[in-house]
A protein has these predicted regions:
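Structural signature of Gram-negative outer-membrane beta-barrels, strongest in the C-terminal barrel
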Residues: 54-157, 161, 193-219, 229-231, ...
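Gram-negative outer-membrane beta-barrel transporters
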Residues: 27, 223, 227-376
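Outer-membrane beta-barrel signature, preferentially recognizing the C-terminal barrel domain
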Residues: 131-224, 277-292, 343-346, 452-455, ...
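Transmembrane beta-strands of outer-membrane beta-barrel pores
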Residues: 15, 29-37, 74, 90-96, ...
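Short loop/turn motifs that connect adjacent beta-strands in outer-membrane beta-barrel proteins
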Residues: 16-23, 75-84, 115, 155-161, ...
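Outer-membrane beta-barrel transmembrane domain signature of Gram-negative proteins
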Residues: 1-85, 324-351
Length: 465
């Protein structure tokens, strides 16, 4: 159950009339309360069902906000400045959980001539931890991890801290027939616990965009736009992991990670075996991405009907993820890679062609996904068993290259005179399937969930009253 109470007031209007236009402002205040609750029954909480045990969630937070926006027309209808407009906004937010934050935005629009628009923005942002991050119920998990004190595969085996906590012949237990780890990244034989963290703070971001829009006078109905953007998110909220906690304790000597009383923490018995492990989300690391958006729209009316075309493409030039604050640990470069958290396509592109005449319309669409590379564990399945690139830092990686995929869609529609619309269509007309990817299990199959699964036919009726 979720509950939101929101009280707000705002005022918009013109503060003054300037030579280039009206000086517009907007101000407002808001008070909001968020509450969430989830109460699994006793059987689910005990782990007696077919699922793992899940604890109850209950909690909320409140905040007060005030904001102001202004739009200032600097120039208009003069040579090389048909329009020059500056916009600015700022918002102050005060949360009863982590405190307060102020975030601002600046924007500039410039039209040197009627057919060309140049636009740019700079903005700050934040994402506050939600109820599940702060107060989510603890749930069981059978995690995969590497104990650094394991005498066969542990990177800290034999150091003083390990010898203090485990026997000299310590082996990490495993959830298999042998009961002993036979490699790094072994699954725990007993359930660990993943919980929430009431001490989380917001993620913060900074973004910059710069773009142009061209509407040539020699081609009425044609609009082209190109935008460059970059976004960096700091203090990201990420799941803490058992391996990270243990490495911090035994490899990096961070004492607080060895004896934590809150947050992520673990307990060993007299034989050195971990009998309890709790992990929580933490604020750490960053995400940085950069890319381009390209958009083409064309519409022309003729005696044979109205023809339209729309082509929207995104090219990602950088996607970087860092889930720790260790200077000697480089960030992960994920652009063009398929990993367990998702498929990071370098290029996504959608093309739509349409025709309309009277009450009838036809559209054809194409959806393009660029190829991907994924980690490969077996040489005989790797198309790139010895891959190296600047982003690998000199490492040789075993990768599998998966091809690009394009899906086609078609629709025929009729606008009925009784204010209704009838559509007959098919998504993935040619019944195309994306490539299997071993890093993207979906419903038990190695298939990225964003791809179509077979052809989809539909008949749709919409009635307006």
């Amino acid at each position: 159950m979720t509950k939101t109470q929101d009280y707000f007031a705002n005022l918009t209007g013109t503060l003054a009339t300037m030579p280039a236009g009206d000086l517009a402002i907007a101000v407002g205040v808001e008070h909001r309360k968020e509450y969430g609750e989830f109460s699994p029954d006793a059987l689910a909480q005990s782990g007696g069902s077919t699922d793992l045990a899940a604890g109850p969630t209950s909690g909320g937070y409140s905040l007060d906000e005030v904001y102001a926006e202004v739009q200032v027309p600097l120039l208009a209808d003069v040579p090389f400045a048909q329009e020059l407009t500056l916009s600015a906004a700022t918002r102050y937010s005060d949360y009863d959980t982590f405190g307060d934050t102020t975030n601002s935005k600046l924007g500039l629009k410039w039209k040197p001539v009627d057919s060309l628009l140049v636009r740019s923005t700079w903005a700050e942002g934040f994402r506050a931890p939600d109820v599940s991050n702060l107060y989510g119920g603890a749930s069981q998990t059978f995690s995969f991890y590497t104990d650094p004190c394991d005498t066969a595969f542990g990177a800290a085996r034999g150091n003083a801290r390990c010898l203090q906590d485990v026997p000299v012949d310590f082996r990490q237990p495993a959830n298999d027939a042998d009961g002993i780890a036979n490699g790094p990244g072994t699954q725990t034989p007993i359930p660990f616990v993943a919980g929430a963290n009431p001490d989380l703070t917001p993620e913060t971001s900074e973004s910059v965009t710069l773009g142009v829009v061209f509407s040539p006078s020699f081609a009425p109905g044609l609009n082209l736009s190109l935008d460059w953007w970059t976004i960096r998110i700091e203090n990201t909220i990420v799941p803490d992991t058992e391996t990270q906690v243990l490495d911090d304790c035994y490899l990096r000597g961070i004492e607080a990670r060895c004896n934590a009383s809150t947050g992520s923490r673990f307990v060993r018995d007299a034989d050195g075996q971990i009998t309890s492990f709790i992990t929580t989300p933490i604020n750490v690391g960053h995400v940085e991405t950069e890319g381009f958006d390209f958009d083409v729209n064309y519409r022309r009316t003729t005696d044979w009907g109205t023809f339209s075309a729309s082509w929207l493409s995104t090219y990602i030039s950088k996607l970087e993820l860092k889930t720790d604050d260790l200077e000697d640990n480089p960030p992960q470069q994920l652009n063009g890679l398929s990993v367990g958290t998702g498929a990071n396509f370098r290029v996504r592109s959608n093309l739509n062609l349409g025709w309309e005449r009277g009450s009838w319309g036809i559209s054809w669409g194409m959806r393009y996904y660029s190829g991907l590379k994924e980690r490969c564990n077996f040489d005989d399945l790797c198309s790139l068993p010895d891959y190296s690139a600047p982003w690998t830092g000199g490492q040789r990686l075993r990768l599998n290259e998966r091809p690009s995929t394009t899906f086609h869609d078609v629709q025929v529609r009729y606008q009925a005179p009784w204010n209704a619309s009838i559509s007959l269509g098919a998504n993935n007309v040619f019944e195309r399937y994306g490539p299997p990817m071993f890093s993207q299990p979906n419903s038990g199959y190695s298939y990225y969930g964003g791809y179509d699964i077979g052809r989809f036919l539909y008949l749709k009726y919409q009635q307006k009253f």
